[in-house]
């Protein structure tokens, strides 16, 4: 995707409810979203984390940015356990993992579905390709 549509999940219930449930949305998340929008990143939010994934399910966005790992994993696994991919952020190199994790418990049994692993690999390759072309 050359210009993915992204939505940001809030950290606090009800996206902070104007500071009643926490100030992170007001002090950190909203300003960050606004900075990204000013840089022409196609991003919106923050949205309440209990409903933001409905946007993805409806095809309205290409990705959801979550505030912590498990916030995104529940929805990701429910919507596509066999094809879900997690992209790690905040580090100087691309890291992707299949939503199901390592699945060591079934390694070597011939029962694993490699769809999510292939998708994670493809996304990592795409990220490296774009990263190298931007350098």
Role assignments for model-derived ranges:
Residues 1-46:
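Glycine-rich phosphate/diphosphate-binding loop of Rossmann-like nucleotide-binding domains
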Residues 28, 32-135:
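Glycine-rich phosphate/nucleotide-binding loop
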């Amino acid at each position: 995707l050359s210009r993915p549509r992204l939505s940001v999940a809030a950290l606090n219930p009800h996206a902070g409810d104007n500071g009643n449930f926490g100030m992170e949305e007001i002090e950190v998340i909203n300003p960050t979203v606004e900075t990204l929008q000013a840089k022409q990143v196609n991003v919106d939010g923050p949205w309440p984390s209990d409903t933001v994934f409905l946007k993805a399910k409806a095809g309205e966005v290409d990705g959801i940015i979550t505030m912590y790992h498990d916030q995104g994993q529940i929805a990701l696994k429910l919507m596509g356990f066999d094809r879900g991919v997690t992209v790690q952020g905040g580090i100087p190199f691309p890291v992707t993992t299949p939503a199901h994790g390592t699945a060591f418990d079934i390694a070597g049994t011939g029962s694993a579905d490699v769809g999510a692993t292939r998708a994670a690999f493809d996304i990592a390759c795409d990220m490296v390709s774009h990263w190298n072309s931007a350098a």
